[in-house]
C-alpha cells in the first residue's frame, strides 16, 4: 500500500531519509520530538514536498512527482481550515467539487458521510455555530468524502480537550474499520497512539529510529521509549 524506498528530502542541505512499508488497512502512529521530521514524512506522501531521491509508492503506483490532488490520499491537519462563510455541508462538499457543483449521487454521498461522523443534524450550520470537536468532524468528513484509501493526519486533535480527543480517536477507529482505510497519524500524545494504532514509528533527526509495537513504547519495554521520556 505505502512504500518509501530511501526517500530523501533535503532541509537546508541536511538529508531526511525514510525507508518504510505500510500494508493496506494498517493504522500507524508517528511520534517523535518537535522538528524531527514527522510532518515532513506525511508531506512527502501527500505531495506537498518532492523527494530529492528515492522511490515513493502509494496504492501500487509511483508518486514521486504526482500533484497532491491526484494522489490516493486525504490529509487532515491540526487546523481544520474550514471556511467561515460556508455551511457544514458546503465545507464537506468542497472535498467533492471545488465549485460545489455536486451531482445528486454526490449529495447522497455527502449526507452518508455526515451521518457516519455524527453531523447529519448540523449540515446547515456555520462553523462558528458548532463546537471545536464538531468542526474537526467536519474537516474529517471532507477528507472521507473523497473516498481515498489512505488517510494522513497531522496532529488533528491536539487542540481538543482530553474527552473530545478520546471521542475523536474512537470515531476514527470506527471509520477506518468500516472503510478499510490505511492510516498514518502524527501525534505528540502516546495515549492517542496506544488507543488507535498497534504500530508506531518514532522519528528522530530525520530518520525512523523505531518501528514496532506501540505497546512496547508505552510500557518502556523498548529502549526507544527513553526518547519519549518513558523509563525503560
UniProtKB/Swiss-Prot annotation:
GO CC annotations, alphabetized: plasma membrane
Signal found in the keyword field: no
The organism's place on the tree of life at top rank: Bacteria
Catalyzed reaction equations: thiamine(out) + ATP + H2O = thiamine(in) + ADP + phosphate + H(+)
Database matches in InterPro entries: AAA+_ATPase, ABC_SmlMolc_Importer, ABC_transporter-like_ATP-bd, P-loop_NTPase, Thiamine_ABC_ThiQ
Residues given in the record as ATP binding sites: 32-39
GO function terms (MF aspect): ABC-type thiamine transporter activity; ATP binding; ATP hydrolysis activity
Topological relation to the membrane, as annotated: Peripheral membrane protein
Bridged cysteine pairs (disulfide): none
EC top class, as a word: translocase
SMART domains per record: AAA (SM00382)
UniProt subcellular location: Cell inner membrane
ABC transporter domain mapped to chain residues: 2-230
UniProt entry tagged with the keyword Transport: yes
UniProt keywords, alphabetically: ATP-binding, Cell inner membrane, Cell membrane, Membrane, Nucleotide-binding, Translocase, Transport
E.C. no: 7.6.2.15
Family note: Belongs to the ABC transporter superfamily. Thiamine importer (TC 3.A.1.19.1) family.
Purpose of the protein: Part of the ABC transporter complex ThiBPQ involved in thiamine import. Responsible for energy coupling to the transport system.
Subunit record text: The complex is composed of two ATP-binding proteins (ThiQ), two transmembrane proteins (ThiP) and a solute-binding protein (ThiB).
The name this protein goes by in its record: Thiamine import ATP-binding protein ThiQ
Organism: Sodalis glossinidius (strain morsitans)
Lineage: Bacteria, Pseudomonadati, Pseudomonadota, Gammaproteobacteria, Enterobacterales
Underlying gene: thiQ
